[in-house]
């Protein structure tokens, strides 16, 4: 009786024959492309001291040998192979664009470059982890915003509601003293804030079970470490416009209380969007205010009752009751100095967000009152970029995060457009 193992062996034979035939077609096609590639260098001028050489190119079916022209570039002084420079990034370990894309996608979906190496070997195209890393670095460096279309494929239309949320997460980087002896640990590791954003159409939120929802399609923004708030704001503004911000029926920004985030909103988006303070973040500040107002009370009942009432009314009808309560506070009645200081700080916080707490109105329209989508995206980002043993260089992280964002947004193909058009 035949077993599943026998079937697997049969499948392997069929796959081997298919790859053999596909590799033959690849070799013929790539040779024609190499023969037709203009013999000009990176400076656009004809190459000198020309000769033919063997070029090894990795494809999804295996390695192909191609005879390609090689010549000396007058501007750079180095020998160039136009075929590889145009289509295969010019490296000694050349890959076709489709092979590059598969390796890049595998790198984004797996937890490490080592896992990418193992998975590539499993589907028949061995690539070492360092070569995958080099590819991602090179690919990320070639990504330019000018290559992207004016509008994303999932951009909001004139009847859509666009949701935008901003936040940040901590990334782990190699410090100035990375690699020094074990006893000198200070300065080995640096932690940097990675500013990020997620945007989506409200119509793309789907219920998957009672109390659980998911976002079908979304668009993310991630910037390298040490990016200034202003540079981050311009990046978010550009991507929000590509997501249809200027033509959407309504736009909502939902964020926690970080000062720099609301400065970004006030300067760049307040004229075209509604701002919402994350409800659960507001509740944390309400709890701090309750602690200050009821400081010294032995019975926790009044504090709990006051906090429950304020949270309920804030969520259902908005900030009116809370703001009236704050404005009626008898500051002299709070005898403890630290409690009075805390109460004033929290009161000022809520007064500054008076226009950002219409939770009842949001709920009536189906608009989220919390930034859970952003928290989820931060978790997903960290699941790839902050795993055990991962310590990034600034340059490597910047390149990879760009590739990762392009892949998540379904726009990885635009990383190839400039080189292919050369």
What name fits each language-model region?
Residues 32, 48, 64, 155-157, ...:
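Sterically constrained small-residue positions within well-ordered secondary structures
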């Amino acid at each position: 009786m035949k077993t599943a193992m026998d079937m697997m062996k049969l499948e392997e034979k069929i796959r081997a024959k298919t790859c053999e035939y596909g590799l033959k077609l690849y070799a013929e096609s790539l040779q024609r492309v190499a023969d037709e590639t203009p013999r000009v260098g990176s400076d656009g001028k004809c190459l000198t001291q020309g000769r033919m050489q063997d070029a090894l190119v990795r494809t999804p079916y295996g390695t192909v040998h191609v005879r390609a022209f090689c010549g000396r570039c007058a501007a750079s002084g180095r020998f160039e192979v136009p075929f590889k420079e145009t289509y295969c990034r010019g490296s000694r370990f050349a890959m076709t664009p489709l092979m590059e894309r598969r390796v890049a996608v595998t790198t984004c979906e797996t937890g490490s470059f080592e896992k990418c190496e193992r998975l590539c070997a499993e589907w028949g195209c061995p690539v070492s982890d360092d070569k995958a890393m080099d590819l991602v670095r090179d690919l990320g460096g070639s990504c330019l915003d000018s290559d992207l279309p004016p509008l994303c494929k999932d951009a909001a239309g004139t009847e859509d509601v666009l949701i935008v949320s901003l936040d940040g997460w901590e990334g782990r980087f190699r410090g100035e003293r990375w690699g020094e002896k074990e006893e000198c640990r200070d300065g080995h590791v640096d932690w940097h804030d990675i500013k990020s954003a997620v945007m989506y159409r409200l119509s793309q939120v789907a219920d998957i079970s009672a109390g659980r929802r998911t976002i079908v399609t979304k668009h993310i923004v991630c910037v390298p470490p040490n990016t200034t708030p202003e540079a981050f704001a311009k990046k978010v503004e550009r991507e929000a416009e590509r997501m249809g911000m200027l033509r959407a029926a309504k736009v909502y920004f939902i964020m926690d209380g970080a000062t720099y985030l609301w400065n970004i909103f006030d300067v760049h988006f307040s004229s075209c969007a509604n701002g919402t303070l994350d409800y659960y973040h507001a509740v944390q500040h309400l709890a701090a205010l309750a602690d200050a107002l009821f400081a010294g009370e032995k019975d926790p009942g009044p504090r709990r009752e006051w906090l429950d009432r304020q949270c309920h009314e804030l969520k259902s009808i908005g900030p009116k009751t809370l703001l009236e309560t704050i404005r009626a506070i008898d500051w002299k009645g709070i005898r403890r100095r630290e409690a009075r200081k805390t109460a004033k700080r929290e009161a000022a916080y809520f007064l500054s967000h008076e226009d950002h707490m219409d939770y009842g109105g949001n709920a009536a329209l189906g608009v989220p009152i919390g930034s859970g989508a952003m928290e989820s995206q931060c978790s997903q980002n960290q699941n790839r970029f902050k795993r055990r043993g991962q310590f990034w260089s600034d340059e490597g992280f910047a390149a990879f995060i760009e590739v990762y964002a392009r892949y998540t947004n379904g726009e990885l193909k635009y990383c190839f457009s400039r080189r292919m058009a050369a």
